Amino acid sequence: AGVGRIGLIDNEKVDLSNLNRQIIHKTSSIGRKKVKSAIDSAVAINPEIRFSPYSKKLNKSNAISIISKYDIIADGSDNFDTRYLINDACYFLEKTLVSAAILGFDGQIFTFRPRGPCYRCIFSDPPKENLIPSCTEGGVLGSIAGIAGTIQATEVVKELLGIGRSLSSNLMIF
């Protein structure tokens, strides 16, 4: 869609268990850094894409400096600590956040605009530890990740271009 520069952050390496829901990676990518694998796959499709890779964990020390460089943030993280950290940084920096989360057969998408309701407004506190299973424990149907990612990407484009009906102030659950 021609969005300019894309920042991609992940500190993990591709694992066999990722392949059913992270189709940007191939079997030959197992053991490679996820950021490098994803960029290589995307550039193979469109060599004009520009990326800023961050092969590190997002944390309290680097979240503001990384997130401040982008107009809109798309969060597909798989843990609550990271979701809340991204939300808090976006809230502080007044950045639009498009959040996507999945587990099992379910997904949720929400667009949080500056000065509007935020992730913490809906989910004030992270769930107690071990209350909600991880993707590895609870499983994820691969097509659910694809649906969530497609809707999330569409929301990002709508927000960047100021077109269409946004999910802002509406939590989509499927």
Where are these regions (language model features)?
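Adenine nucleotide-associated cytosolic modules
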Residues: 1-174
